[in-house]
Amino acid sequence: VDLLLDAAATGRNTVEREGISCTHPSRFVLIGSMNPEEGNLRPQLLDRFGMVVDVQAEEDVDRRVQIIENRLSYEKNPRYFCRKYAEEQAELAEKIRTAREFLPCVKVPKELLRLAAEICIAYGTDGHRGDIGMIRTARTIAALDGRKKASREDLKRAAHYVLPHRMRKNPLESGQMAPQIMEEILS
């Protein structure tokens, strides 16, 4: 795992075998999944994940039924199932392409840099990856919305993806962000 993280951080990968060493450019995004019930990851490793999305099981019966129906439909005919969503997927892909091109135009006011630092301090995050990740994510949210300037609301939304896995907490705590802290800083 450490080798992957090093390659992701440096943008270079070194392969060594039988006395031969080869280094080449390596640009990739690491995407992982885990089940917290199977154990915890080291904090140093968690800090390397830019964002975390906590996926909970659906509790609404009608939505669960829809999930089951979708899965069965996909298993029966994957091509037909994918065609049903092709237009929606193409629109989303175009929105992402447009945002990627627009991203360099998105500005972050100095006030947001300060707020990001204050939020990270208030939530007890170690290091600076949380601050930087929150700013990058806020810019991305603004780009997706077609705005030229990141806002406090973008920063607040970004914090929910970037900070929970970085917060210092006891093993028995949930990692949920206390909303009153965020509101106090942003007010």
Spell out what each predicted region is.
Residues 1-8, 40-48, 61-66:
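Conserved AAA+/SF3 P-loop NTPase catalytic/coupling segment centered on the Walker-B
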Residues 1-21:
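Conserved catalytic/switch belt of AAA+ P-loop NTPases
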Residues 4, 33, 49, 116, ...:
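Conserved RecA-like P-loop NTPase ATPase core
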Residues 15-33, 47:
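AAA+/SF3 P-loop NTPase mechanochemical coupling elements
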Residues 52-62:
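Conserved AAA+ ATPase "SRH/arginine-finger" region at the nucleotide-binding site
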Residues 66-105, 119-122:
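Conserved AAA+ ATPase "sensor/coupling" helix adjacent to the nucleotide-binding pocket
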Residues 105-116:
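Acidic catalytic patch
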Residues 115-132, 140-187:
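C-terminal engagement/docking regions of AAA+ P-loop ATPases
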